[in-house]
């Protein structure tokens, strides 16, 4: 009896040892990889390697708008088949709110049976109250603006912008516009704040939509700011927004776009150690020489383009001819 018990115990031990030997633990599931950030060193190197300064001569004030030739404008006009127009501007915000710290000033100054008139003022032309076009005299790097012009000599509080002002675009911008509708790519109504849009997202959209932005085009990117606002209400946009990741900078240089339009100029909240929120905004404006349309509203354009399965169109942008101005309110128009 004792012998059988010892034998049984021995067999049990052998079985356990064998089971342990055969067990191979599976690797633990990993969460989504955190994309590396563009480092300050890379950012500084790109300022030299990707710069367009001097490309169109030492006296240039147009930057990549030089890529919009008469031939380019005629090709854009050929995209008009129906004569349907769509505004890309958000309505001017005349009341202060969480996302409008500096509203547009508006008031009636007369209203009689004979006539009526109002007054409108833009105390913060680059603020969150209106869709606007930035000139190169708006943001700078180390005391220099687009094409290397010294800021101290050419942009002053008393004299405004003697170079690179909004007046350089008095005759307007007409070119091919291309919409990159990232929420539609992802199958969502809008992206959540903090979402970073990478070059592969842009190229995935190109594959899905069958369209590609190129030299002299207007690159318009939608993340769904206004759709989110309509559903959830206003929120401080400087504290919560999606947008293009800084890794898009070399992609923009390669594509040679003439103009960029977006709903917000950056993404927040940002990962620890990231570059400042306006790093991409400032690089494109000052180093690449690409003018920017800030606070655009692409929701109506998204619907119009989807209804036609056409993501390219003629785009016109006409800033006010403000001498020595750093920017202007605009109402960009897409025409199908």
Give the residues covered by each predicted segment:
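Bacterial N-terminal signal peptides that target proteins for export
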Residues: 1-13
């Amino acid at each position: 009896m004792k012998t059988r018990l010892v034998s049984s115990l021995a067999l049990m031990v052998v079985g356990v040892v064998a089971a342990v030997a055969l067990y191979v633990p599976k690797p633990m599931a990993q969460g989504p990889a955190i994309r590396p950030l563009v480092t300050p060193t890379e950012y500084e190197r790109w300022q030299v390697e990707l710069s367009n300064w001097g490309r169109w001569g030492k006296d240039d004030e147009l930057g990549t708008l030089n890529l919009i030739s008469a031939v380019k404008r005629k090709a854009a006009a050929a995209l008009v088949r129906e004569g349907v127009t769509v505004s890309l501007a958000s309505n001017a915000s005349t009341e202060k709110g969480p996302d409008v710290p500096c509203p547009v000033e508006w008031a009636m100054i007369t209203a009689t049976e004979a006539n009526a008139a109002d007054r409108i003022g833009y105390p913060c032309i680059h603020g969150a109250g209106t869709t606007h076009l930035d000139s190169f005299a708006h943001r700078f790097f180390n005391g220099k603006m687009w094409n290397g012009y010294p800021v101290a000599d050419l942009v002053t509080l008393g004299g405004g912008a003697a170079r690179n002002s909004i007046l350089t675009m008095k005759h307007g911008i007409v070119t091919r516009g291309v919409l990159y509708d990232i929420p539609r790519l992802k199958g969502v109504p809008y992206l959540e704040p903090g979402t970073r849009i990478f070059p592969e997202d842009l190229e995935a959209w190109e594959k899905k939509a069958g369209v590609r932005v190129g030299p002299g085009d207007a690159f318009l990117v939608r993340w769904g700011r206004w759709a989110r606002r309509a559903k959830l209400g206003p929120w401080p946009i400087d504290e919560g927004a999606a947008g293009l990741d800084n890794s898009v900078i070399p992609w923009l240089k390669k594509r040679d776009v003439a103009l960029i339009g977006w709903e917000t100029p950056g993404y927040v909240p940002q990962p620890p150690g990231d570059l400042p929120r306006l790093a991409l905004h400032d690089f494109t404006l000052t180093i690449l020489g690409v003018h920017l349309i800030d606070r655009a509203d692409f929701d109506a354009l998204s619907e119009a383009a989807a209804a036609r399965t056409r993501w390219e169109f003629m785009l016109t942008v006409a800033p006010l001819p403000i001498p020595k101005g750093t920017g202007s309110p605009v109402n960009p128009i897409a025409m199908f």
